[in-house]
């Protein structure tokens, strides 16, 4: 910094100290300017908090948000274009219902109903994905641009104005000790900064209908999401009511006890249970899992390490390259090409 620059910084600091500690009064700006400045300050705070809350509205689980951020960063580093999507709660519940509905089979009324509800929830998850994309593009991104460009520029003008105001007030109180030319230049710079800040705030506040338009687009997207979800649920409700009506017309069967087959009992007259036949390496047939083909050492936070031959419980497929699973009470991500799937995840 030049000598002149250091001198100016000293003037500002000295004037600020005088105002804060000694109670000296600085140059007052007009009420209209102060009113605009207050509205800009409130708008800046509103935009910052709305951006945060809008993201929570679309993706309420902070752990999943952090996980997605890490995975998408890793994908970018690997040169992968496709980003990992947020796992919608409707989709997760739908997967669960589909899995057990199919296991119960088509001869089970409850199983068939689980499949129908699961498929409907999967459709709702797709609609929610569309809402996420729509709101991000038409509401969150424009607000982010507003914060990063317009409000940032206004903030720059206001900070510059305050600096020049302090410099001007310092020199104004030292008339006779400071050359008149310096005071005149300080006045000109102060007035120039005030005009720039005033014009930028005025133009922003006069065009705030743009933000109203963005809110309208957000509401329209939310309305469309709820409209489509209502249609899906209404159709599902009709199916379930029809299934209940048909089930009430089917005659109930009487329970008929079956004779016990004693041919396979052991010496004590007790048939071995299925659980007693399992060894420590047996895998439940209904539990999605995989076996490690190679040792995998985690390099990043959130990754799950394992050894060759380890049996890992599968909980989710993140993308075409990564699984999420559990091993010995720990959960994390690991590459698909390091394992052999034994029981696949439900589709």
Curated annotation (Swiss-Prot):
GO biological process terms on file: endocytosis; negative regulation of clathrin-dependent endocytosis; positive regulation of neuron differentiation; regulation of clathrin-dependent endocytosis
Coiled coil regions, renumbered to chain: 180-201
Domain BAR as annotated: residue spans: 18-249
Subcellular compartments: Cytoplasm; Early endosome membrane
One of the record's GO molecular function terms: lipid binding
Membrane topology (UniProt): Peripheral membrane protein
InterPro entries: AH/BAR_dom_sf, BAR_dom, Endophilin-A3_BAR, Endophilin_A_SH3, Endophilin_SH3RF, SH3-like_dom_sf, SH3_domain
PROSITE patterns: BAR, SH3
SUPFAM superfamilies cross-referenced by the UniProt entry: BAR/IMD domain-like, SH3-domain
Residues in the signal sequence: none
Domain SH3: 285-344
Tissue: Expressed at high level in testis and at lower level in brain and liver.
Gene Ontology cellular-component terms listed: acrosomal vesicle; cytoplasm; cytosol; early endosome; early endosome membrane; glutamatergic synapse; postsynaptic density, intracellular component; postsynaptic endosome
Renumbered residue ranges of the record's region Membrane-binding amphipathic helix: 1-21
Keyword Zinc: no
Sequence segments annotated as region (Required for dimerization upon membrane association): 60-87
Annotated Pfam families: BAR, SH3_1
Keyword Protein biosynthesis in record: no
Function, as annotated: Implicated in endocytosis. May recruit other proteins to membranes with high curvature.
Entry domain remark: An N-terminal amphipathic helix, the BAR domain and a second amphipathic helix inserted into helix 1 of the BAR domain (N-BAR domain) induce membrane curvature and bind curved membranes.
PANTHER family: ENDOPHILIN-A3, SH3 DOMAIN-CONTAINING
Other observations noted: Cells overexpressing Sh3gl3 show inhibition of transferrin uptake. Olfactory epithelium-derived cells overexpressing SH3GL3, DRD2 and GRK2 show accelerated differentiation upon addition of apomorphine due to reduced agonist-induced endocytosis of DRD2.
Family: Belongs to the endophilin family.
Protein name: Endophilin-A3
Originating species: Rattus norvegicus (Rat)
């Amino acid at each position: 910094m030049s000598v002149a620059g250091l001198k100016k910084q000293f003037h500002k600091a000295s004037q600020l100290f005088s105002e804060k500690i000694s109670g000296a009064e600085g140059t007052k700006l007009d009420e209209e300017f102060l009113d605009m400045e207050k509205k800009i300050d409130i708008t800046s705070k509103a935009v910052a908090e709305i951006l945060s809350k809008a993201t929570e509205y679309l993706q309420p689980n902070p752990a999943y948000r952090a996980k997605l951020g890490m995975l998408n960063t890793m994908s970018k580093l690997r040169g992968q274009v496709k980003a990992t999507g947020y796992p919608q709660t409707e989709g997760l519940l739908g997967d669960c219902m589909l899995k057990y509905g199919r296991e119960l089979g088509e001869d089970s009324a409850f199983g068939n109903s689980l499949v129908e509800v699961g498929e409907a929830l999967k459709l709702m998850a797709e609609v929610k994905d569309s809402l996420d994309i729509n709101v991000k593009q038409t509401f969150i991104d424009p607000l982010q641009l507003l914060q990063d460009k317009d409000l940032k520029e206004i903030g720059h003008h206001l900070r510059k104005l305050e600096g020049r105001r302090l410099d001007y007030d310092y020199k104004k109180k030292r008339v006779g000790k400071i050359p008149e030319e310096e005071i005149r230049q300080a006045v000109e710079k102060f007035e120039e900064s005030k005009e720039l800040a005033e014009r930028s705030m005025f133009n922003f506040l006069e065009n705030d209908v743009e933000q109203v338009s963005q809110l309208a687009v957000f509401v329209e997207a939310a309305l469309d999401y709820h409209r489509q979800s209502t249609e899906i649920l209404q159709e599902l409700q009709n199916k379930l009511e029809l299934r209940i009506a048909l089930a009430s017309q089917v005659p109930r069967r009487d329970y008929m006890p079956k004779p016990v087959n004693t041919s396979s009992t052991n010496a004590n007259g007790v048939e071995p249970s299925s659980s007693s036949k399992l060894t420590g390496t047996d895998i439940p047939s209904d539990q999605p899992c995989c076996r490690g083909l190679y040792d995998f050492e985690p390099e990043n936070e959130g990754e799950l390490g394992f050894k060759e031959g380890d049996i890992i419980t599968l909980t989710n497929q993140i993308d075409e390259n990564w699984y999420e699973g559990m091993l010995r009470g720990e959960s994390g991500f690991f590459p698909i090409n390091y394992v052999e799937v034994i029981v696949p995840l439900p589709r």
